[in-house]
Curated annotation (Swiss-Prot):
It is found in: Secreted. It comes from Lycosa singoriensis. Contains 6 disulfide bonds. It comes from the Eukaryota. Disulfide bonds join C56-C70, C63-C76, C69-C87, C78-C85. Residues 17-54 form a propeptide. Its main location: secreted. Belongs to the neurotoxin 05 (agouti) family. GO terms for cellular component: extracellular region. One of its GO terms (molecular function) is toxin activity. This is U13-lycotoxin-Ls1a. The presence of a 'disulfide through disulfide kOR' structurally defines this protein as a knottin. Residues 56-95 form the Agouti domain. Residues 1-16 form the signal peptide.
């Protein structure tokens, strides 16, 4: 039974890949007609807007210093001194440091973890 299931799965996978290649090659050869959108007039007035540059960098994006990173606790981590810098997660101390030195992307509040607080 397991062998039959594996055989059917392999045949189905081969069928899917071969039919996908036929559609891709037909599309590249312009053999398929373009689909006409009946609501195209409705969206004709909307023009695509240019993406504006952000004033801060998300996690994993390039940065020059901690003030370039968006999140309050994000820090600019560099490999080999000042090369290959990117924004990574920091901690509460990072937020306090950013609050003191950053003029742009300055944190409004610094989150504290609830792990060390005593209850009761």
């Amino acid at each position: 039974m397991k062998i039959l299931f594996v055989l059917i799965s392999i045949l189905y996978a081969v069928y899917c890949f071969s039919s996908e290649e036929d559609v891709d090659s037909a599309y590249l050869a312009n053999e398929l007609e373009p689909v006409e959108d009946i609501n195209s007039e409705q969206y004709a007035a909307l023009e695509p807007k240019e993406e504006q540059g952000r004033s801060c960098a998300d996690m994993g994006q390039d940065c020059k210093d901690d003030c370039d990173c968006c999140l309050n606790i994000a820090t600019c981590n560099c490999w080999f001194g000042r090369y290959f810098c990117s924004c990574t997660f920091g901690d509460y101390q990072t937020c306090l440091r950013k609050k003191g030195k950053c003029k742009r992307n300055r944190p409004q509040s610094c989150p504290r973890s609830n792990l060390n607080r005593k209850k009761g």
